[in-house]
Amino acid sequence: MALYGCVGAMALPSELIVHIFSFLSDRDKLRASSVCARWRECLFYPSLWTELKLRVGGGANREGSGSEQTPRLEFLMRNFGSFVRELHLEVTPVDGYLSPLSGVEGRIEPVERDPQLLDRWKDAMITYLEQVLCVLGCIRNNRNLQKLSLYGDTCILQDEGILDSADLQQVDQGGKKIKEIQQLLVEVLSNSRKIKWLSSAFMLGVVTPCSLASLSNHSAGSLEHLGLLDNQLPCLVSPVELERLVHLRSLALDFCDFTSELSHLLAGGDRAPLHRLSLMLNGAALEAKPLDGTASEDDWKALVQRSANLRVYVMALDVCSQDLLRVLKPSLPLERIHLDSYSTLVTDGTLELIAQQYNKTLSHFVLMRDDTGFPDLGINRNEDPLVLLAWRCVHLSVLVIHVAFSSV
């Protein structure tokens, strides 16, 4: 920088220094602040840090391990947490999370737990709890917060799989830190005044069925996007709380939680039309959270009549074709679908149904498998159903087919 080491740098007015900072990236702001003490004082001017994107956790990488990132996180949140308007926190996965599972003839079988991997996961969990406490603690009194986005890791930060309840008990005895995290979120929501975007996906122990009740009336009236995705058994969004969100235009939740009652509420004439609906269907959870009571064909018709521009995104994880055919109603305005599975086959009948019912709305189709035996096309077929799907869906712009080949 031309002014580096010059007396002139200290003589510049604060307004001009802040204006210079406004043209720099976050990293360049930090470098420029080393010019002198006066520039460092201007570094934390609120208008310069309206948005903060943080990625923490995971294994060792060029940016350090998850625990090594904690002091940096504390520094940023201590200086910006009280006034930042948009905060995005992403927890990255630990390396090697797939090793506890092994595919056997199209099935997933548990193998012996790796002690070293388990230790890494426990360390990641401890770090996760500390970092989430830090973030929520620093924004608890932020009344200007407009966007809060928390994204965890589906494979690690869940009280299931390789991290069972006994492991979690060792990390957080009595659930003290989890309870503290939940209380901090309640304070964040109750103190908020302008939240327009609230999203929490796969964040262990952060959101409870009672969390939305603490949302202030001001934020309830301004909220436009709500995303609550988790594998918890109780529904995180109740009709009573959803009724308060009259300006909601985008909603993301578990497919099993999108009940007929919620659909009727969203189709009401005293609220803003819904533009985007994202639904996650987890096949492994269907036994505990059945599809009974989810939106029917008539419910979808009423919702689309009220929200003419509604588009739906469905992510199906390890869902059998029978359950897929059950939820893919004709009136569902499907725009994007992501089929990701390790132990179930995507049948040609499912592909044909999608191609026929959603030929005028489907724009994104993603098919991911962990073996080479998909889709199940049968033996007497001349037409490839994937080719027919691409041909029939006139607005299809993204087609992704991913196969993980394994050596025999």
Residue ranges and their predicted role:
Residues 1-408:
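The conserved beta-strand core of Leucine-Rich Repeat
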